[in-house]
Amino acid sequence: MIYKLTPALRDDLKTPFGTLYPGKGESCLAKVVKALDKPPKIISIGDVTTFYLIKAGVVPDMCLVDDQTMRLPVDHEVRKGTSHHTFKELRVSNPAGVVTQALMDLIKDNMSSTEPVRIFVDGEEDLAVIPACLYAPIGSAVIYGQPNEGVVVVRVTEEKRKETKALLDKMERVDE
């Protein structure tokens, strides 16, 4: 099953899904790190967000990257900086504008990993926020970049899971 983003939903997703921390780079992620308060899991989505999170001394329990930012290749420093010697490295295909069943399964199956997981996405990882919020333990933090605004932290609650499931239900379903 592939879940495809509809034009109406694309507009809805421009609104941050959690708490927006305005700014960019190290200063923005420093505010995020200070506010984290030891969640059960930290999941970062996006190369630049993951890079600055690791640079701030926080290795996420799971990160999803695609070697791009705003549809352009990231520089060598960011690409290298999203790697960490403790990561279990995985790979999945997920085209832009969709959430594939393979992406959902990989996130779900590895959420309980005791070692940090880095998932390289062939395609686009932006919508991985949806399965991350569905499968992360309650209290976890899902962190992603909001283009030209800052970084968003989604605290996983039962209510947030219901919102996430509702988003997934609004997406167009296509057989693979």
Swiss-Prot record:
- What Gene Ontology molecular-function terms does this entry list? GTP binding; kinase activity
Q: Which residues bind GTP?
A: D47, V48, D66, E125
Q: Which GO terms describe its biological process?
A: coenzyme A biosynthetic process
Keyword list (alphabetical) reads: Coenzyme A biosynthesis, GTP-binding, Kinase, Nucleotide-binding, Transferase
**EC code(s) of this entry:** 2.7.1.237
Q: Where are the transmembrane segments?
A: none
| Recorded metabolic or biological pathway in which this protein acts | Cofactor biosynthesis; coenzyme A biosynthesis
Q: What does it catalyze?
A: 3'-dephospho-CoA + GTP = GDP + CoA + H(+)
Question: Where are the annotated coiled coils located?
Answer: none
Q: In which family does this protein belong, per the annotation? A: Belongs to the GTP-dependent DPCK family.
As for what it does, the entry says: Catalyzes the GTP-dependent phosphorylation of the 3'-hydroxyl group of dephosphocoenzyme A to form coenzyme A (CoA).
Name of the protein: GTP-dependent dephospho-CoA kinase
Q: What species is given as this protein's source?
A: Methanocella arvoryzae (strain DSM 22066 / NBRC 105507 / MRE50)
